[in-house]
Amino acid sequence: MVSIHNSFILLMLMISICFCEKCLTNEECDLKWPDAICVRGRCRCSENTIRKKSASREWVCLATNDATGNSGPPLTCPTPEGAGYQVMYRKDGEPVKCSSKKKPDTCPEGFECIQGLSILGALDGVCCPDRAKTCVHPIFDHPDDGYLSRWGFDGEQCIEFKWNPERPSSANNFKTRAHCEDYCIGSINGITNYHQSNFHLF
């Protein structure tokens, strides 16, 4: 009797693991990451982006090009798209590399290891702000020379601002309001554990 009960629990656990990332529509994927589409029950990142695992978001899309359209660096963070290299955790000015396969993660609190675009070897990733820390980064508004519309979380809601990708930025930078709201308002309970004073650009 006990073994049947344990087998049933194991079966239910396997079903929940198998179906936790299933998608039915393009809209639900697009909400989680702009322009992602649902292909055979799995969200697929758009052209010029690659899907990578994320401990705080399940998955993220990394841009293969920088925000100006040129080939991007092999190590980058998911946001801001095309300029994620600006927000990597650094020590003595150098990006802190990590292993995306090692558990637990070796990144400091508030950061998670995101695998690079084309990096091989034991240290195949870089420490990026996790979901909660991303949402408490300051918004870098560039009203004078910003030419791209972006959205950032101000602690209460997502607001629109102008962004110049060639100037310093923070991870609190999203292409769409829906992406900002899903990223930040969807995890608002975890956000209160972080403070803006923990933010360091480099």
UniProtKB/Swiss-Prot annotation:
Disulfide bonds: C135-C184, C158-C180
Keywords: Disulfide bond, Signal
GO terms of biological process kind: cuticle development involved in collagen and cuticulin-based cuticle molting cycle; protein catabolic process; vulval development
Limits of the BPTI/Kunitz inhibitor domain: 135-184
Function, in words: Appears to lack serine protease inhibitor activity in vitro when tested with bovine pancreatic alpha-chymotrypsin and elastase. Involved in cuticle biosynthesis.
Record InterPro entries: Cuticle_assoc_divergent (IPR053014), Kunitz_BPTI (IPR002223), Kunitz_BPTI_sf (IPR036880), Lustrin_cystein (IPR028150)
Tissue: Expressed in larval and adult hypodermis, hermaphrodite vulva and adult excretory cell and duct.
Domain of life: Eukaryota
Knockout mutant characteristics: RNAi-mediated knockdown causes blisters in the cuticle and abnormal localization of collagen col-19 in cuticle dorso/ventral annulae and lateral alea.
Signal peptide stretch: 1-20
GO MF terms, alphabetically ordered: serine-type endopeptidase activity; serine-type endopeptidase inhibitor activity; structural constituent of collagen and cuticulin-based cuticle
Signal found in the keyword field: yes
Protein name: Kunitz-type protein bli-5
Pfam families the UniProt entry points to: Kunitz_BPTI, Lustrin_cystein
SUPFAM superfamilies reported for this sequence: BPTI-like
